Amino acid sequence: MGLSTLEQKLTEIISAPVEALGYELVGIEFIRGRQSTLRIYIDSDDGITVDACADVSHQVSAVLDVEDPITVAYNLEVSSPGLDRPMFTAEHYTRYLGEEVTLVLRMAMQNRRKWQGIIKAVDGEMITVTVDGKDEVFALSNIQKANLVPHF
């Protein structure tokens, strides 16, 4: 997924303290607004607890206070990816081949920005998703948001 320059910088700053605590940094989102939000998604083989989120929040806050990459006031949120897990990297798509995904594109393809289908293949920075029986190819850089579709 095409991250903004700020999101790339934040990922570089945040990854070390998250990994030092034994967690995987799944991805981040920085949502600008009247009250901006920095959302950090973490995971581990044992799952994520509220205490894990608090530990990561404390460590990341300390690092961000020193580095100070965000010039506006913001809320920091740390959470597990959840059932509708966000997808940020080619590795995420590879890990979930055969699963259903919802995509929101930065620039429309075939007059559509929202797509839903089954992840069929990953080739470098391109993913193939089967939508209504037809294979569609998307550049990761054109994907604004992607989430797994949970099935119960």
From Swiss-Prot:
GO terms for cellular component: cytosol. Disulfide bonds: none annotated. Keywords: Cytoplasm, Ribosome biogenesis. Required for maturation of 30S ribosomal subunits. This is Ribosome maturation factor RimP. Belongs to the RimP family. It is found in: Cytoplasm. Coiled coil: none annotated. Its main location: cytoplasm. GO terms for biological process: ribosomal small subunit assembly; translation. InterPro entries: Ribosome_maturation_RimP (IPR003728), RimP_C (IPR028998), RimP_C_sf (IPR036847), RimP_N (IPR028989), RimP_N_sf (IPR035956). Gene3D superfamilies: Ribosome maturation factor RimP, C-terminal domain (2.30.30.180), RimP-like superfamily, N-terminal (3.30.300.70).
